[in-house]
Amino acid sequence: MDLKKSSTKKIVLAGGVFDIIHPGHIHTLNAAKALGGVLVVAIATDKTAQKMKKRPPLHNQELRRELVSCLSMVDNAIVGHEDNIFETVKAIKPDIIVLGYDQIHQEQFISDGCKRINLDVEIVRLQSPVPHLSSSEIEKKYGKDIHGL
């Protein structure tokens, strides 16, 4: 998917599970959108989401992609590649990769991986716009009740 052909604006790539969309996601995606002009969001596959969260996601990857694609700041939502984030990066060819404050990826790891695939990408780590608001915090507060919905 080469979005550069259709746009002179910078392409920003953000990623995540997005199983329980909350105001922290909205603020983060708005901040990501403000860095460029085209915001592409890569949704973690079900397998990756389960590895990251240590439980199956509430919604499957296609439903999560559909939910995120409905957000006004998102120009394109895709399901990411399994087990290799750089396959997704190579397909999108972003100018900027945005990392949320709570994402496990280190900037240097992303930078080194992009260099290996010959992409010159700016890495930006966003700070939490809504302190102490994350899917994990919501899950801690409501526990198993949220999974019984």
PLM regions with names:
Residues 1-149:
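Nucleotidyltransferase catalytic core that binds NTPs
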